[in-house]
Structure formats: C-alpha cells, structure tokens
Amino acid sequence: MRNAGGDKPFSTPVLLREMGLKTHVDDDPKTKAYRLIGYAAVTFSTVSVICFCVTMPVVFTYVQSVKRQMSHEMATCNVNARQIFDDVAALRAGFPFAQAGNRTARQAGYDVHPSKPTPVGYSGGDAAAAEVKGNSPAAAYEDKPFVAVGVEEGPHTATTGSDSEGTCHDCCLPGPPGPPGPPGRPGPNGKAGANGLNGNPGRPPEAPCEPVTPPPCPPCPAGPKGAPGQAGYPGADGQPGSQGDNGEKGSDGAAGEKGRPGPLGKIGEPGATGETGENAENSEPTPGPQGPPGAIGPVGSRGTPGHPGEDGEAGAPGAPGENGTDGENGEDGVPGVPGHDGKAGRAGERGICPKYCAKDGGIFFEDGTRR
C-alpha cells in the first residue's frame, strides 16, 4: 500500500497507529521499558538543571560573604598585630634601669630600634650593646618615629632619650585611646619554640634597682598655623536692589553727517477717471482687408462606441473534440479492520531426533516408539 504521492509505502502498524488503533508493537515489553527509561532520563535531567540554577546563586552569595568576612578579620588582625608591636617597642624603650652591673647582655631575641637609646643595664661591662635586627615583624616598624613611654606609679608621661639632664623638649602627651575594636577569634596555638641558650651566671647584687622618676614635661607650645582651607562654594544670589535715581541729562551731541539717499518710493496710485469723450459721427462701415488663414486646430476626442448589434442565427454544430487526458488516481481508501484469527492447523509430524540409541542398534524416541 502506497501513500497519496505514490513515493513510499505505508506499513500496516503505522496506518493502524495513525487511525488510533493498538497494535502488537505497543504491547511489546521492550518498548514499554525503553519508553519508561526515556521518560525517567528526561525527568532527572530537568530536575538536575533546575537544582543547578537554584543552587548556583546561593553558593555564590555564601562564598562572597565568607570572603568579605575573612578580609575583615585579616584587616583586624593586622591592626592588632601592629598595635602589639608598637606597645612592645615602647615598653622596651620606656624602662630606665639603674646603673647596676647585675644585668648581662642577651645574645639573641631582642630587636633594637635604631633611633632609641640603649637602656642602661643591658650592657655588660664597658662593651656597648650591639644593634640586633632579626626577622621578626618588629623590624618592619624601624622607619617610624620612636616614642618612649616612661612607667611610674603616677600618671603615664612620654619621655625621650634626652631626659638625662632633667629637661623635656618637643614632647607631648599621647592622645586619648581609640575605640576598642571588635573582639577577634582565638588564634591557633603556635608551635613550640626552640630551647634558648644557657644564660651567663648572675652577678651578686650591688644595689637595688629603683626606677628613676623623670621630671614632668612642660606644656607644649602652640603649633604653627595650618595652611588656609580651600575656597568655599559661592553663596546664593542676593535679593535685587532698589531702583537708582535718574541720571542727569547729557549735553547735546554734535550734528551728524549727511545721510545717504533713501530708497526709491512706491509707485503712485492711478489718477482720477477723465471726462467722457464725444460720440463718433455716423458713417457707412468699410470692411477691412482679409486676414491670413488661421492655424489648424487640434484633433477632436474619440466618439462614444455604438450600440451592439443583434445576435445572428445559430450556426451548424461542430465536430466532436478529442478525448481528454485521464485524471489522477484517487487517494487510497481507509484500510480495513484486521480479520479474525484463522483456524488452528493440524498437528505437526513427529520429530526425527531420538532420545537415545542402544548398542544393539535400536533407536528409542520420546513417545516410547522404537525403530
């Protein structure tokens, strides 16, 4: 059976499926299994894409928040570390010890700022204390101006290395402490450091170490004036003032030069109508000379068509025409309903495969016969 175009034949299952009838192909378990697997694969793929579209923005937002929080904590940690190193450097330089020989120089572990004096008591004998620059983070602050803080029982005052003479120049009290920062998270435990070298044997005490109280600093003079600030924005426009008095009349000016000739004036209006002339005298008319022939006029427009004439008498019948070409084949009809199952066929012939063969030549079959 072919389609309307006659190009490709239709199979019976396809025609039945187009008609809405079930075939034995639809009841095939393999087809059902493949169809179920296809539906499941499409469903899982769609759910996976939807989950990815929903989860990706959430993960991106969480990563951004964690990154922002880590940056804030790192900045806070750097500020706290810098403050600790500043305080340690200030405390190391702010303890003046008495002239006692009961302290020996340490070999390692202390960073000495190049601009601060060597504390008394940290040198052994006549040897000067050497400047030690380690790889500790405190070495990063050597370029900053050094400020030593003296420690005593009273209020804290700032001191410098020139306090040995009892005077204080260009020193000011420190400003008020800033607001406390947010509490940081406890850091991990550091690794255990290496054991230090054995210290030198101590000397017998000669005199008790008493802190020397530095004299109070005089009030600092007023600083120089700062640079003038930037010019402010222009103010709003003021209200309009009152009208002023009329000025005095000026003197007459000099006579001007002769002006240029003006343009031509407009054409005057027509004059009044004159008086009526006298009537001519009656006389016989005299024909004038004949004029030249005029030009040929244009062709006139086409006239309207006349009324149609009456029909003539019918002519003799003509000869019959030739047979026309055959028309195209019509479309195939709707296929019929499949017929009923045929009658069961007769029983098949017995098989020729024996069940077993005896040694004496007999052949036995499953139905008990022997040949």
UniProtKB/Swiss-Prot annotation:
InterPro entries attached to this UniProt entry: Col_cuticle_N, Collagen
Transmembrane segments: 38-60
Keywords: Disulfide bond, Membrane, Nucleus, Repeat, Transmembrane, Transmembrane helix
Subcellular location: Membrane; Nucleus
Superkingdom as given in the UniProt entry: Eukaryota
Phenotype upon gene inactivation: RNAi-mediated knockdown causes hypodermal or cuticular rupture, typically in the anterior body region. Dumpy body shape. Defects in cuticle integrity.
Family: Belongs to the cuticular collagen family.
Name used for this protein in its record: Cuticle collagen 71
